[in-house]
Amino acid sequence: MRRMRGKSILAVMLSFSMLGGVLSAGGEIKNASAEMATETPEFGTQIITEDMLNTTPDKDYKVDMSMQGDAKDGDYNKYFLDDDVQTVKINIDENNLMYMFQNASDKPQVMTNQVTIGDETIGYAGLKTKGSYTLENMPYGNSRFSLTLNFGKYIKKKKYGATQNFHGLSKVSFNNFYFDKSMLKEFCAWKVLSKMGIPTPQVGLAKIYINDKYYGVYFMVENMDSSILEQYKKVDKSEIGDYLVKPEYYRMEYNTAMDQFINAEGDFDLSEHLKKNENGDYEASEALHNAIGGLWEYDNDTLQDVAKMIPTVLKWQKKLNQLYNGTDFSGKKIDVNSDEYVKLLDQVIDVDEVVRYYATHSFLVQTDDMFTGEKNFAVYVDKNGKSMMLPWDYDLSMGCFYPTTASATANFKITQMYDPERNDFGYNEEEGYSQYPLFYVIYQNKSLMNKFKKYMKDCSKIAALGGTLSTGETIEPGYINSCIEKIQDKLQAAATMPLTSGGRYINASQPADMKKALPSIKKIYAMRSVGVVSQVDGINATVCGSGCDLSAVGNGQPDRFISMRGKMAIVDEKTGIFAVNTYLGGFAASLTATKLTQDSEQYKTIQSNVQLDAGCNAVEMYSLSAVGSPIDKYTVYVPTASKYKNTNLVLYNYKKDGSTEKVSTKKDDNVYYGEVSELGTLVLATTSKVENKTNTNTTVKKDQAVKGKTYTVKGVKYKVTANGTKRTVTLVKPTSKNKKSITIGKTVTIKGQSFQITAIAANAFAKNKKLKKAVIGASVKTIGAKVFYQAKKLKSLVVKSKKLTKVGKNALKGIQKKAVIKVPSSKLKKYKKLFKNKGQKKTVKIKK
């Protein structure tokens, strides 16, 4: 959480008044809370001292090994819910709790008795307050602090046989929504970050109970820890380097004074400047401390964590700064737009990941960042001296720090990640970025900035417009809107529950404020998506922010006046449909797009009256209406679902007078667009049949296989997953476990139709005690969890498929220890990674 600066003297005075502050006759601001604390404690009935705390776990406590895990397996992910609010119950000695509350600003660690998350209970986790601005500005007597749980703080390997974790999770935090009336700002931001393939923590929402008293809803987030990278890279903790920090010195410019520590071999020799004291802790010499700057947080614990990595990090920093200055590693000038530059840069940073990070960060308009002097990011440098960027702290995303209004946020320049009025950035973008090597090494290369823009468009697809991402993943339109709608009712119910005495939501009246914020947080994601696409694709329309109030979301401002002049875009947040037109002035404009269901009377009426070309079939209809008075034709943009990915669609406009206007239709990925004379009902039509269970033009004959049903063919059960233009099935399981050999073909014939076998269901051949050989056909793309679990005699597995993308957890656990897996030679390297750590013994071989 950032340390926020006051905007005016009045705001400061009001803030202190709200917090219990008083202004003395001499103008000195005093804290009434502190004075009151000398008479009676802010929390509890007496002052709690350290000697009154319970700090020792039961000596006979046993670590529940069934709850211990490796972060790489992601077993704890299921406790961070997508469509519900998790329940977290903390049982703690009352003295420990009051001590933590009474000393909240010092963030003391206290011991809990037990913590229950969902249906799992774990003993003796550490608990502490967290934050900076939130702690400094908590209203007097309010106990709704942000919190962190540390599962292994008191249960260490030396005493208890294992350093305790929660299914692989070491620490989890609970943020109190200080700047977020919607309670969904960070939740949505992390959805976009995760979909963009950036290493991100697990997140969710949680109801917190402490000693059976309800403290309300919190944002639940995995701590910035190696567990994030272990899961992202699918590796053991031992393979992750120790340098994962939120650096104090956010610019990361190399200090040439560090050259004094370089030895003849070109390495940094810190043996005389980084030594252990009598307590076994590392200490840095004054010379090293002065030269090194803020490469890590200014605390002793972090120094101990990163000490061994410092020489590697310094070498990384020097190389980064050489490229930033336009030279190679020998100091020779280099063309920053050359292939050689990118190759050298890829030795220093994970180029693709870093570009993705900055593109997503820019899309989210999170200007409370390194470019405004804050630390809300992390840097990871691996053991080989190559770095990644990890995002952090998005409670002020979507313009709620700067530029603060919906119109300004939606149209925020895609390469601007800063407030031009803060620090020394000024209004010269290139000059400003040139002081930040971490980004400037990307910014100064044209091809990388083109990739940056492509990834920003990917963010628009994720947030609202749908389509195929650069990774090949397909996203449905309205993704963020659907994420919100899945959880909003559960969230509202949790926010409605009365809080314990002394617990109050800060800067919000819940659940009223959350409910009020919902339309605006949905709209801002759709508006920003269109604003980015408008810039990247050269549409050059200004998105109208009408109907979106960022002050309702939290910490933003309403649009006081929206000038409807020039080329403007209006957008519907639910469908992602947007329209562009020219305006000469007038009131703010907005768009509403209502999808008509095929069984509605309106749909049936239009279907019977709309005049389509011969052979065209209507598949979807959207009734459009708008506020505003444009002077030209509308250009409408219609994002379509993935089921139309391989289908050519055309647009028709059913006008208010009952006539039909055929639209000259163009296509960009999944978005169809064209000009219409007025906004009526848009009809999407196709000349081919589309796999669509609600499409009346697609019928299934009685003698055909039915999607969703299971059929048995030659002793094997198959479930039909598609029976349209494409026909696919999942192999469920054989009817008998007595077969010694099984061959999964490329296709299977069901009711006279040929279906591709594209998947093998979980547990399909589990505990088959006679199976010795299995052949996986050429169409299989996914192998489910525990497919060959405890098939103890399985010694030969032949994979013919070159399309395999996923192998489930423990798919090979318990197969013969000397088993051989044969794969296509062209896929050997990829499939070795794919089959890695699927439960098999290390003696199992994978070869071509």
Describe each region flagged by the PLM:
Residues 671-692:
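C-terminal beta-strand-rich structural cap/linker in extracellular carbohydrate-active enzymes
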Residues 600-650, 655-656, 688-689:
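Proteolytic processing hotspots in large secreted/extracellular or virion-associated proteins
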Residues 113-176:
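Conserved oxyanion/phosphate-binding beta-strand-loop segments in alpha/beta enzyme cores
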Residues 20-38:
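Sec-dependent signal peptide cleavage junction
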Residues 722-724, 737-759, 769-782, 792-806, ...:
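Structural signature of tandem-repeat unit edges
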Residues 44-57, 66, 96, 285-372, ...:
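Middle-to-C-terminal accessory/interaction subdomains
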Residues 155-156, 176, 197-201, 213-359, ...:
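Internal "kinase-insert"/substrate-recognition segments embedded within catalytic cores
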